[in-house]
From Swiss-Prot:
Pfam families: DNA_primase_S (PF01896). This is DNA primase small subunit PriS. Its cofactor is Mg(2+); Mn(2+). Heterodimer of a small subunit (PriS) and a large subunit (PriL). The active site is at D95, D97, D302. Catalytic subunit of DNA primase, an RNA polymerase that catalyzes the synthesis of short RNA molecules used as primers for DNA polymerase during DNA replication. The small subunit contains the primase catalytic core and has DNA synthesis activity on its own. Binding to the large subunit stabilizes and modulates the activity, increasing the rate of DNA synthesis while decreasing the length of the DNA fragments, and conferring RNA synthesis capability. The DNA polymerase activity may enable DNA primase to also catalyze primer extension after primer synthesis. May also play a role in DNA repair. Disulfide bonds: none annotated. It is an enzyme of class 2 (transferase). One of its GO terms (cellular component) is primosome complex. CDD domains: AE_Prim_S (cd04860). GO terms for molecular function: DNA-directed RNA polymerase activity; metal ion binding.
Amino acid sequence: MESKTSTYLRARFREYYLTASMDAPPGMEAREWGFIFYDTPGMRRHRSFRSRKELVDYIRSTVPAHVYHSAAYYLKPDAPTMKEKIWKGADLIFDLDADHLAEYRGSGIRDFREMLERVKGETMKLLEFLLSDFGFDERMISVAFSGGRGYHIHVRDKSVLKLRSDARREIVDYLTGRGLDPERFIHKIGVDGDAGVERARSLRGPASDAPGWGGRINKAIESMVMHLRELDDEEALRLLKNVKGIGKQKARLFLSQIREENAIKSIRAGNLDFFKHASGIWNLIIPYIMEETVRALGGETDEPVTADVHRLIRFPESLHGGTGLRVTSLSINSLHAFDPLKDAVVFGDDPVHVEIIRPTTLELMGERFDLLEGKTELPEYAAVFLLARGFAEVG
């Protein structure tokens, strides 16, 4: 980045910060703060502030490109080493970023809207886990658009404050469905005969109202069965034979039985043993269903971020130095309607002369820009974005 470009960006950022509200996070005085500047390499960290005013005055006077605070709370947040800081606990945080989604790794800004919509979907999925499976109070959860390629979730419930890294990794494992064992959900139970003597063993799965992954797996089983029932025999048999270990004979048996009137009712009750030889067939199908369920319903998040109890994360209402977009605080209810390419834009539309150094296509504020190398004039909001991203220099 040329010096005239960084000077221009600092001027625009200062303009924003002079009027931005910048509400401090809970316990701000116990958090470590870090800053990255356009004209200085590395991060300036191990800072602490006793009040919101002190923090805001610092940001307005120094105009950083990026502002971070720790998820952790410390006795001495400005101490130079972690040991000296004395850790008191940390929020449970989740970083959902397009880089965690295989189809968007290394993608440019051409796919920005589609990419952000996909990450928003993953964020909403993870929030559902936190609210329904873990039972966190919605008031203890905050969400923020990162200003870049994703979203952050902060859980500030007392129950998570003292969790160490291994416990936080276990939470990520649950959210992502990593290591789910079919035997945990599918098992045989004894069926009593005369005088209490066990006469048989029946295959059981989770019922439709089972909590957590159990309920999700039941609904996935029902969904698969309903789909197979709607297909003609040839197509249904073809799909079943894709499951390892299921040949034509087993596929025909399974298909005929799931088309029986009581099949769906039995599945919803968790009874999978409603036809002869059911056990052997279900034992082949269930792992396949679970794999597909985890792929479709499991959350996506950056495990190292969640597990790191000393992590720094972006300060909501600050600007992202790599886009010029605002790190935007959101309620869970407002997330669905939030459009980061409009709602996180803070700059106006005054014309700015820039030189495009990398051809690109950009969509911001409902406008599409198809840009080739060379000098051009852009509205300020688009110019700031491209300058911050390194696609342009001040003309």
